Amino acid sequence: MAKKIEYKDLLDAGVHFGHLTRKWNPKMAPYIFMEKNGIHLIDLNKTLVCLDEANAALKTIVRSGRKVLFVATKKQAQEVVTAEAKRLKMPYATERWLGGMLTNFATVRKSLKKMSSMEKMMKDEAFSSLNKKERLVLSREKEKLEKVLGGIADLTRLPAAIFVVDVKKEHIAIAEAKKLGIPVFAIVDTNSDPTIVDFPIPANDDAFKSISILTQAIGQGIEDALSERKREKDDAKLKEDEESKKASDKAEIQ
């Protein structure tokens, strides 16, 4: 288990810097510490509490074997969110949100199967027999699908939760999740409505350092849950093997 995130870590990463006071959403009032130089400052003690609550809930989801979809299409979040999702072998959408990715998942699955078929076809000898134009068309189509859907290529069923950076930018993804009853975990800045998500984490959603530290904190929680799940499965397998051996030994004695 990695070092637990502390108040100073959040402070050093600028997690407390909100938006200009004139851009605030009054529903964020419970999470705001003060106003300074026309900017709202977020109460980092509240951020820590919310982060703990989010990780505890995510832990339960991940230990059940379900997936968490990472969603972050804003430029400064794409790299770190993609890297963390890949590290955890979790699905992600960081290029753009394809409308219906959740609410029309059956159609999305068809596109994923098409992408998989194209990949197999391009490795086949038959691909080289196509003329140059046909190969180019096929390659471009696959590339286009991969750009949008590559991050969810291994998603065989709807995710059990989504983790979002910037609720204003990802409002379509959040609306789709809410419609399907999928819990939403999100970094929420002072210009946003925290009530539209299930687990808001009040924080600066614009600065790279802030996005990084919180995404990695969420990622660490998920990693811990995955390790616990593996341990539980290994223990169950060991117990099963022991019971089987006992039964076998008993049968031999008889």
From Swiss-Prot:
<dbReference type="GO" id="GO:0022627">
    <property type="term" value="C:cytosolic small ribosomal subunit"/>
</dbReference>
<dbReference type="InterPro" id="IPR023591">
    <property type="entry name" value="Ribosomal_uS2_flav_dom_sf"/>
</dbReference>
<dbReference type="Pfam" id="PF00318">
    <property type="entry name" value="Ribosomal_S2"/>
</dbReference>
<dbReference type="InterPro" id="IPR005706">
    <property type="entry name" value="Ribosomal_uS2_bac/mit/plastid"/>
</dbReference>
<feature type="region of interest" description="Disordered">
    <location>
        <begin position="225"/>
        <end position="254"/>
    </location>
</feature>
<dbReference type="InterPro" id="IPR001865">
    <property type="entry name" value="Ribosomal_uS2"/>
</dbReference>
<feature type="compositionally biased region" description="Basic and acidic residues">
    <location>
        <begin position="226"/>
        <end position="254"/>
    </location>
</feature>
<keyword id="KW-0689">Ribosomal protein</keyword>
<keyword id="KW-0687">Ribonucleoprotein</keyword>
<dbReference type="InterPro" id="IPR018130">
    <property type="entry name" value="Ribosomal_uS2_CS"/>
</dbReference>
<comment type="similarity">
    <text>Belongs to the universal ribosomal protein uS2 family.</text>
</comment>
<dbReference type="GO" id="GO:0003735">
    <property type="term" value="F:structural constituent of ribosome"/>
</dbReference>
<dbReference type="GO" id="GO:0006412">
    <property type="term" value="P:translation"/>
</dbReference>
<protein>
    <recommendedName>
        <fullName>Small ribosomal subunit protein uS2</fullName>
    </recommendedName>
</protein>
